């Protein structure tokens, strides 16, 4: 219940700050933000992936010291000082992590990945539009 209350508060705050912005782009952004708030709530409530995660398929994380990960929340899969990115990206460690992500073995509300995950998931579009209309 506390998560639900907080989610509603976040949505109201976003709406307040964006209410003077009336371009179509602004309305789409507001719809996406509303959808993402609902997505975070559902993810935390169900403790599982709600939409597919693209980490490891179109994303990579490179840390200043050269470590590479598929996501900031997953273990490092290699280091650019030791191997090139192609070798790291195609490594068995990377493939294992991709399989686990695809199977839904990890779930999160990662603010950097979730917007792209939602945009690349067409079944989410009706809910994004509903959030646009509500606002």
Label each residue range with its predicted role:
Residues 1-55, 61-64, 68-69, 75, ...:
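Radical SAM enzyme [4Fe-4S]-AdoMet core and its adjacent flexible, acidic
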Residues 48-50, 67-135:
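Flexible mid-to-C-terminal extensions adjoining Fe-S/redox cofactors in radical SAM and related proteins
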């Amino acid at each position: 219940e506390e998560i639900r209350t907080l989610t509603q508060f976040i949505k109201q705050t976003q709406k307040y700050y964006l209410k003077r912005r009336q371009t179509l782009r602004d309305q789409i952004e507001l719809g996406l933000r509303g959808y993402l708030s609902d997505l975070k709530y559902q993810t935390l409530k169900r403790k599982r992936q709600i939409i597919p995660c693209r980490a490891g398929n179109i994303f990579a994380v490179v840390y200043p010291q050269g470590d590479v990960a598929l996501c900031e929340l997953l273990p490092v899969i290699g280091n650019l000082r030791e191997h090139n990115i192609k070798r790291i990206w195609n490594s068995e460690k990377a493939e294992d992590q991709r399989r686990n992500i695809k199977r839904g073995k990890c779930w999160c509300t990662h603010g950097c990945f979730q917007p792209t995950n939602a945009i690349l998931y067409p079944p989410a579009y009706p809910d994004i539009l509903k959030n646009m209309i509500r606002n």
